[in-house]
Structure formats: C-alpha cells, structure tokens
C-alpha cells in the first residue's frame, strides 16, 4: 500500500489538479494507494471539495477547526499513517499546492526498494532543479540548506528543506513508537518540522538517499504559508535543543535508538561539519556566478 500525506490550507484551486495526477500515477500500483489529507482550518472551499472527492478517490480527511500550522498538521498526518499502515507499506509526503509533481513518486519508491528508509526529492541532484523561484528565495533556500548540512549532517542528504519525501512505513512506525508525541516537537515554529523529522529519524539510524526532482513553483496555486522569520527562529531553537548537553536530543536519544544502534550524527565534530560544507559553498558560489553571467548577458 502507498499512503500519500497532504497537508492542506486553502487549496481549493490545487486539489482538482493534484488529486487526479496522484491517481493517474498510483492507480496501477499492485498494492493500491490511499490519500490522507489534513485540512488545517481552511477558509475557502477546501473542506467541501475534499468531501466531494471522497466519493472518487480512496481519501481520508483530518479536519482542524482552526489553522494550527504545518507542524501540527504534519504530526497528525504521520501519527495517522503510523496507525493505519502495515510495516511493508510506503509513505509519500508531498505538498498540496501542485508544486510537487506526482510523476516523481515512482523514482522515490524505486530508491526505497534499494533498501533506504527515507528518500528525499532533491533539487540539488543532477537532473534536478526548480522553476518559478525568485533569486532571493533561491539564495535563502540554499543558505538554509548549507546551515542544516553543517549543523545536522546526514549521510546521503544535501536537500533538507524540501518536504517531498518517501518513507518506509516501518521506519515511521518505529519513530512514532520511540519518540511518542515528540516525533514532531516544534509544532509552532513554521516549517521547522520539515527539518525536525529528518533529525529525529537520523537519531534512530534511518538510511537516507535522494533522487532528482524539479520543483514547479511556477504552478503554485495558493499563497505561500512560510514565514521566514519564524522558520529561522525554529532552526536556531532546534540547534539548541539538539546540542544542549543537559537534556538535549543527542544527550537523551543517543545510544537509545531501537535495536541498540548509535545514531551516526554522534561522531561529528565542528571541524568535520565545516569540512563537509565545502562542496556546498562551491555550489553557492557557482550559482551566484551563473546568475551574474545571465544578468550581464541580457
């Protein structure tokens, strides 16, 4: 079974486009599929449309009476997925605004079949990219990913901020069982939960990989929900929570992961963290030079 998780807030324009595309990609899957949507207090016709689509697609809806934010929506979605899935199932989490094309789902699933636990759709892999993203947003995104790579190094990952990912259901079930309600702890700090899931899964020794992905921001059909200042604050708070020597995540969870495995993050030092960022720094410099060339050639 493939379980697709969609956090939705004011997505009346996106749902009629996205749901048929998901269906077209997954309808032929031998084990079937299921979509779980969290309607996070939408003020438009999202709830009405979801009710209508329940007669067309294998769709379950979680309703929030008010807008609680991406953190709480993600928590409810992943806890529900852990409850209804079997260990052999796969979980796909993607955005509901039509910027994440379902056509990449097969490559995500194929990489899971290679033995990985978490596969991230990456703009930074060869063949990946993005359309419709301003130069400012590209700079912010790449800078944020550099920060995350330095302070939260995960083998096999360069793309930390994209929420388009595939998970083994057994990995999510193990994480929810291990962390309880703290699997997604920073629920009120914007998009910080997108990073938190990776960090928490890394602490239980999940295996990570990436596949190329093209972000279609030019197809976005709803207003952006991200508040950069709140998310930046969340990253700083998470850094303290992770590395605080008295009761921080590393101190509390290190060596206590299921099966007795130590998390790979435990062996990193500030020197190795900085060294690992060198490739990404060169990438940022190359991107700036490319933009300067394009500006000069116009």
Annotate the PLM regions.
Residues 60-83, 90, 100-184, 219-226, ...:
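Acceptor/aglycone-binding surface of glycosyltransferases and processive sugar-polymer synthases
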Residues 6, 31-41, 62-64:
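Short beta-strand/loop segment that forms part of the nucleotide-sugar
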Residues 18, 46, 74, 103-105, ...:
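Acidic donor-diphosphate engagement hotspot in glycosyltransferases and nucleotidyltransferases
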Residues 39-48, 66, 98:
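A conserved acidic beta->alpha catalytic loop
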Residues 1, 107, 181-298:
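Hydrophobic helical membrane-anchoring modules
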Residues 11-26:
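Short, well-formed alpha-helical segments that are part of the catalytic scaffolds
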Residues 13-16, 42-53:
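Acidic helix N-cap motif at the loop->helix transition within catalytic regions
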């Amino acid at each position: 079974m493939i379980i697709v998780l969609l956090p939705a807030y004011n997505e009346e324009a996106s749902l009629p486009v996205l749901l048929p595309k998901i269906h077209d990609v997954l309808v032929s899957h031998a084990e079937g599929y299921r979509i779980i949507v969290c309607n996070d207090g939408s003020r438009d016709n999202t709830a009405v449309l979801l009710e209508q689509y329940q007669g067309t697609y294998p769709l379950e809806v979680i309703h929030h009476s008010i807008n609680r934010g991406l953190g709480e929506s993600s928590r409810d979605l992943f806890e529900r997925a852990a409850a209804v899935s079997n260990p052999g199932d796969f979980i796909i989490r993607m955005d509901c605004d039509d910027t994440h094309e379902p056509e990449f789902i097969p490559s995500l699933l194929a990489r899971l079949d290679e033995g990985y636990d978490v596969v991230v759709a990456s703009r930074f892999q060869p063949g990946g990219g993005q359309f419709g993203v301003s130069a400012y947003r590209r700079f912010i995104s790449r800078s944020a990913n550099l920060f995350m790579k330095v302070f939260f190094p995960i083998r096999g990952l360069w793309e930390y901020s994209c929420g388009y990912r595939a998970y083994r259901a057994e990995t999510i079930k193990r994480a929810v069982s291990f962390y309880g309600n703290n699997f997604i702890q920073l629920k009120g700090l914007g998009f910080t939960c997108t990073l938190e899931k990776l960090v928490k899964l890394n602490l239980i020794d999940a295996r990570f990989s990436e596949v190329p992905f093209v972000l279609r921001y030019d197809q976005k059909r709803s207003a952006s929900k991200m508040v950069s200042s709140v998310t930046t604050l969340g990253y700083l708070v998470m850094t303290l929570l992770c590395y605080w020597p008295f009761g921080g995540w590393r101190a509390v969870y290190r060596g206590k992961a299921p099966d007795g495995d130590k998390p790979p993050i435990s062996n990193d030092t500030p020197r190795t963290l900085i060294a690992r960022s060198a490739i990404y720094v060169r990438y940022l410099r190359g991107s700036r030079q490319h933009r300067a060339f394009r500006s000069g050639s116009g």
